[in-house]
Protein backbone atom coordinates (compact mmCIF):
# COMPACT_ATOMS: atom_id res chain seq x y z
CA UNK A 1 0.00 0.00 0.00
CA UNK A 2 2.91 2.31 0.62
CA UNK A 3 4.22 1.95 -2.94
CA UNK A 4 1.17 3.50 -4.72
CA UNK A 5 1.13 6.39 -2.24
CA UNK A 6 4.80 7.05 -2.81
CA UNK A 7 4.30 6.89 -6.57
CA UNK A 8 1.49 9.44 -6.42
CA UNK A 9 3.68 11.70 -4.28
CA UNK A 10 6.48 11.54 -6.85
CA UNK A 11 4.06 12.28 -9.70
CA UNK A 12 2.58 15.22 -7.81
CA UNK A 13 6.04 16.60 -7.05
CA UNK A 14 7.07 16.37 -10.71
CA UNK A 15 3.85 18.06 -11.81
CA UNK A 16 4.47 20.94 -9.41
CA UNK A 17 8.05 21.26 -10.66
CA UNK A 18 6.86 21.38 -14.27
CA UNK A 19 4.22 23.98 -13.39
CA UNK A 20 6.75 26.20 -11.61
CA UNK A 21 9.19 25.88 -14.53
CA UNK A 22 6.49 26.85 -17.01
CA UNK A 23 5.48 29.79 -14.84
CA UNK A 24 9.09 30.99 -14.63
CA UNK A 25 9.46 30.63 -18.39
CA UNK A 26 6.25 32.60 -18.91
CA UNK A 27 7.48 35.31 -16.53
CA UNK A 28 10.69 35.79 -18.52
CA UNK A 29 8.96 35.44 -21.91
CA UNK A 30 6.09 37.94 -21.87
CA UNK A 31 3.54 37.86 -24.72
CA UNK A 32 4.03 41.58 -25.42
CA UNK A 33 6.73 44.24 -25.08
CA UNK A 34 7.47 45.15 -21.46
CA UNK A 35 9.22 48.32 -20.27
CA UNK A 36 11.91 47.40 -17.74
CA UNK A 37 13.64 50.74 -17.17
CA UNK A 38 13.03 54.40 -17.96
CA UNK A 39 14.88 57.58 -17.07
CA UNK A 40 14.15 60.79 -18.96
CA UNK A 41 16.96 63.36 -18.85
CA UNK A 42 16.61 64.98 -22.24
CA UNK A 43 17.10 68.54 -20.95
CA UNK A 44 20.28 67.63 -19.10
CA UNK A 45 21.85 66.01 -22.16
CA UNK A 46 20.78 68.91 -24.38
CA UNK A 47 22.63 71.29 -22.04
CA UNK A 48 25.58 68.88 -21.91
CA UNK A 49 25.75 68.79 -25.71
CA UNK A 50 25.73 72.59 -25.94
CA UNK A 51 28.41 72.82 -23.26
CA UNK A 52 30.68 70.32 -25.02
CA UNK A 53 30.16 72.04 -28.38
CA UNK A 54 31.01 75.41 -26.83
CA UNK A 55 34.11 73.98 -25.20
CA UNK A 56 35.19 72.45 -28.50
CA UNK A 57 34.84 75.78 -30.32
CA UNK A 58 36.63 77.62 -27.51
CA UNK A 59 39.66 75.33 -27.37
CA UNK A 60 39.85 75.07 -31.17
CA UNK A 61 39.93 78.87 -31.46
CA UNK A 62 42.70 79.02 -28.86
CA UNK A 63 44.70 76.43 -30.80
CA UNK A 64 44.28 78.37 -34.06
CA UNK A 65 45.21 81.65 -32.37
CA UNK A 66 48.34 80.14 -30.84
CA UNK A 67 49.49 78.92 -34.27
CA UNK A 68 49.16 82.37 -35.80
CA UNK A 69 52.60 83.95 -36.20
CA UNK A 70 52.88 87.26 -34.35
CA UNK A 71 53.57 90.31 -36.56
CA UNK A 72 57.23 91.22 -36.91
CA UNK A 73 58.08 94.86 -36.17
CA UNK A 74 59.38 96.98 -39.06
CA UNK A 75 63.01 98.01 -38.58
CA UNK A 76 65.03 100.59 -40.50
CA UNK A 77 67.05 99.16 -43.35
CA UNK A 78 70.31 100.63 -42.10
CA UNK A 79 69.95 99.19 -38.60
CA UNK A 80 71.77 96.00 -37.73
CA UNK A 81 69.42 93.09 -37.08
CA UNK A 82 70.51 90.99 -34.09
CA UNK A 83 70.41 87.23 -34.34
CA UNK A 84 67.27 85.91 -32.58
CA UNK A 85 67.41 82.36 -33.93
CA UNK A 86 67.26 80.69 -30.51
CA UNK A 87 64.45 82.96 -29.34
CA UNK A 88 62.40 82.30 -32.48
CA UNK A 89 62.83 78.54 -32.03
CA UNK A 90 61.62 78.68 -28.43
CA UNK A 91 58.68 80.84 -29.45
CA UNK A 92 57.74 78.42 -32.22
CA UNK A 93 57.96 75.41 -29.90
CA UNK A 94 55.86 77.20 -27.28
CA UNK A 95 53.18 78.11 -29.82
CA UNK A 96 52.97 74.59 -31.23
CA UNK A 97 52.93 73.09 -27.74
CA UNK A 98 50.11 75.41 -26.72
CA UNK A 99 48.16 74.51 -29.86
CA UNK A 100 48.56 70.78 -29.22
CA UNK A 101 47.52 71.20 -25.59
CA UNK A 102 44.42 73.21 -26.48
CA UNK A 103 43.47 70.69 -29.15
CA UNK A 104 43.91 67.80 -26.72
CA UNK A 105 41.75 69.44 -24.05
CA UNK A 106 39.01 70.24 -26.55
CA UNK A 107 39.06 66.71 -27.96
CA UNK A 108 38.95 65.22 -24.46
CA UNK A 109 35.91 67.30 -23.46
CA UNK A 110 34.09 66.49 -26.70
CA UNK A 111 34.93 62.79 -26.52
CA UNK A 112 33.91 62.45 -22.87
CA UNK A 113 30.58 64.22 -23.44
CA UNK A 114 29.85 62.18 -26.57
CA UNK A 115 30.73 58.87 -24.91
CA UNK A 116 28.70 59.62 -21.79
CA UNK A 117 25.61 60.56 -23.79
CA UNK A 118 25.93 57.47 -26.01
CA UNK A 119 26.29 55.13 -23.02
CA UNK A 120 23.64 56.65 -20.72
CA UNK A 121 20.51 54.53 -21.07
CA UNK A 122 17.13 56.23 -21.38
CA UNK A 123 14.96 53.09 -21.50
CA UNK A 124 15.15 49.30 -21.64
CA UNK A 125 12.39 47.36 -23.40
CA UNK A 126 12.05 43.57 -23.29
CA UNK A 127 10.53 42.45 -26.57
CA UNK A 128 7.65 40.01 -26.82
CA UNK A 129 8.85 36.47 -26.29
CA UNK A 130 11.72 37.52 -24.04
CA UNK A 131 14.44 36.76 -26.60
CA UNK A 132 15.46 40.32 -27.51
CA UNK A 133 15.89 43.60 -25.69
CA UNK A 134 15.92 47.18 -27.00
CA UNK A 135 18.18 49.75 -25.36
CA UNK A 136 17.59 53.45 -25.98
CA UNK A 137 20.37 55.89 -25.08
CA UNK A 138 20.15 59.65 -24.71
CA UNK A 139 22.70 60.34 -27.47
CA UNK A 140 24.17 63.83 -28.08
CA UNK A 141 21.78 66.71 -27.32
CA UNK A 142 19.24 64.18 -26.00
CA UNK A 143 18.09 63.18 -29.49
CA UNK A 144 18.05 59.49 -28.57
CA UNK A 145 19.40 56.40 -30.29
CA UNK A 146 18.22 52.82 -29.94
CA UNK A 147 19.32 49.34 -30.93
CA UNK A 148 18.02 45.81 -30.38
CA UNK A 149 20.19 42.86 -29.36
CA UNK A 150 19.52 39.28 -28.22
CA UNK A 151 18.97 39.00 -24.49
CA UNK A 152 21.77 36.44 -24.12
CA UNK A 153 24.24 39.10 -25.32
CA UNK A 154 23.44 41.44 -22.42
CA UNK A 155 25.04 41.02 -19.01
CA UNK A 156 24.51 43.10 -15.89
CA UNK A 157 27.82 43.44 -14.07
CA UNK A 158 26.29 44.16 -10.64
CA UNK A 159 23.00 43.71 -8.82
CA UNK A 160 20.73 46.70 -8.30
CA UNK A 161 21.34 46.63 -4.57
CA UNK A 162 25.14 46.53 -4.88
CA UNK A 163 25.77 49.85 -6.64
CA UNK A 164 24.99 53.31 -5.25
CA UNK A 165 24.31 55.26 -8.44
CA UNK A 166 24.98 53.62 -11.82
CA UNK A 167 24.16 50.09 -12.93
CA UNK A 168 26.66 48.86 -15.58
CA UNK A 169 25.43 46.77 -18.51
CA UNK A 170 27.77 44.91 -20.83
CA UNK A 171 26.61 44.34 -24.41
CA UNK A 172 28.56 41.83 -26.48
CA UNK A 173 30.42 43.40 -29.39
CA UNK A 174 30.24 46.97 -28.02
CA UNK A 175 32.98 48.76 -26.15
CA UNK A 176 32.45 50.35 -22.75
CA UNK A 177 29.58 49.74 -20.38
CA UNK A 178 26.07 51.10 -20.76
CA UNK A 179 24.97 52.96 -17.64
CA UNK A 180 21.55 52.79 -15.99
CA UNK A 181 20.96 55.53 -13.44
CA UNK A 182 19.34 54.07 -10.31
CA UNK A 183 17.35 57.28 -9.99
CA UNK A 184 15.31 56.03 -12.93
CA UNK A 185 12.10 54.01 -12.79
CA UNK A 186 12.03 50.20 -12.78
CA UNK A 187 8.39 49.26 -13.53
CA UNK A 188 8.98 45.52 -13.14
CA UNK A 189 11.93 44.83 -10.86
CA UNK A 190 11.46 41.05 -10.74
CA UNK A 191 11.37 40.69 -14.52
CA UNK A 192 14.35 43.05 -14.83
CA UNK A 193 16.41 41.00 -12.37
CA UNK A 194 15.58 37.75 -14.18
CA UNK A 195 16.34 39.04 -17.69
CA UNK A 196 18.44 42.16 -18.30
CA UNK A 197 19.66 42.39 -14.71
CA UNK A 198 21.13 38.87 -14.72
CA UNK A 199 24.86 38.23 -15.05
CA UNK A 200 25.99 36.30 -18.12
CA UNK A 201 29.46 35.27 -19.22
CA UNK A 202 30.02 37.01 -22.57
Swiss-Prot record:
One GO term of the biological process aspect: mitochondrial cytochrome c oxidase assembly
Residues annotated as transmembrane: 44-64, 98-118
Subcellular location: Mitochondrion inner membrane
Entries under InterPro entries matching the protein: Tmem223, TMEM70/TMEM186/TMEM223
Record carries keyword Lipid biosynthesis: no
GO CC terms in record: mitochondrial inner membrane; mitochondrion
Chain ranges on the Mitochondrial intermembrane side, renumbered to this chain: 65-97
Keywords from the named record: Membrane, Mitochondrion, Mitochondrion inner membrane, Transmembrane, Transmembrane helix
Stretches in topological domain Mitochondrial matrix: 1-43, 119-202
Main location: mitochondrion
Superkingdom of origin organism: Eukaryota
Oligomer and partners: Associates with the mitochondrial ribosome.
PANTHER family to which the protein is assigned, alphabetical: TRANSMEMBRANE PROTEIN 223
Protein name: Transmembrane protein 223
Organism the protein comes from: Bos taurus (Bovine)
Amino acid sequence: MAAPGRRWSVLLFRALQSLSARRALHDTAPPRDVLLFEHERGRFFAVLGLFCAGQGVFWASLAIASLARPPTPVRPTDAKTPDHGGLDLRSTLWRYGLAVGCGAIGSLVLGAGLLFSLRSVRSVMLRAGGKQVTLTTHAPFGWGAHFTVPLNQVSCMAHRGEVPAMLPLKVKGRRFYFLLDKAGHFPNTKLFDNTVGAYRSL
